[in-house]
Amino acid sequence: MAWKDEIQHVVVLMLENQSFDRLLGFVRLDDASQRIDGVTGNETTPAALEDPARVVRLERGTAPALYITDPTPGHQFEDIAVQVFGQPRVPDPPTPTMNGFVDNYARQAGPDGKPIGSERAAAGLACLDPALVPVITMLAKSFVVCDRWFSSCPGPTWPNRFFVHAATSNGYIDSPTDMQALAGFLTTRFRMRTIYENLAAAGRTWAVYFGDHAQAFGIGTLHRYARDNFRRLDAFAAEVAAGTLPHYSFLEPGYMDAPGSPAADQHPPHHLLDGERLIAWVYDTLRGNEAVWRKSLLVLLYDEHGGFFDHVPPPATVPPDPASATAEKFKFDRLGVRVPALLISPWVRKGRVDHRVYDHTSLLATVKGLFGLPDFLTRRDAQANALDDANFLAAPRALVDTPANLTALVPSHAPAPRAKKLSDLQQSLMVLSAALGAIGGGGAPGAGAAGNRAEPQSP
């Protein structure tokens, strides 16, 4: 296929904690034959699992208040088990019911310390009207939507981001506590072979670009690449403009609020439009150099669903390795909840829906084939579907056939209220930052980010 000969740059932007149905469930494409498996606004779910006859409707969300979700829906393993299976563990046999989202969220504590209840939970889990998220909607209509892309495990950020780099989390399914984050960073627990070693072995270039913290640097095998391969997000723009973009680029958003630079990861309670602006910035930057754009594939992904409703049951899969197959809580034999995923390039078809099953390791399988890498990393990426050739064209689309200046689509908005405390993810990243500072003398990526709540960050 021509695209495999022509694509020289794969760029991955992975944001945080949104389900497919929440961001893309109501999107309708111009070609009626291309139907996204989304929602209608008539979906109902039990208000409480102990009383399944009492249901609530998950309606189309049109209120700007939905840009900020507070409290954050549960998205640890036990929460996801309730959401998917209706109980805080995976049953035997594992039959997903997808009926525990409202029940689980209703138990989260509000500002008064009391559970928010099913009515508020149902309202907070509404799937969004496409007009609320104009950037991702425009990209979905203009490029390829993957409506069977699942997170790699039913867990939170850390294990799923490990999967996108290493095709395994070494049996790790939770958000790390402070001591676990530190211990994992300092010991062999987080030392997995990654796609980056394989890229280097094949003579391919790569970089991780980050806003304030490089969560990827929690993987011990990447520490030796700190000086040459980890860069701030503004370096991405400079390298695109100069035509020096590496073969593989992984972009991490800013996870923390700072004056003049709000968190752009879309992790609740951060403002969704700040993430929309980052998506637009990455796209506009890449498209701004036509020579680079014509040789690029941008993959927009989310690490996990963040506790938000999705109606498609996650399928079974294979454990990546023995450490995962024998893990105590979960055997890593089922994917996590579906997440938004878009393929963006002049080489992809306009307004197409890809219904193949993918997870984050599909990205690794695709990169292996595209760049001639030596080996698969684990059993998981070895059996994962690579991107379907049917998504791609025999020749690239003209620049005028792709949308321009997506940044202009993002409405102005007041900043999100500052959270009273750090999320589990932010806390673990702060611990990682402290460890980096102690070990790397401030020279490691993210080592200087401990003060990121007081100083502006890139981009």
Model segments located where?
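N-terminal pro-sequences and low-complexity stem/linker regions of secreted or lumenal proteins
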Residues: 1-459
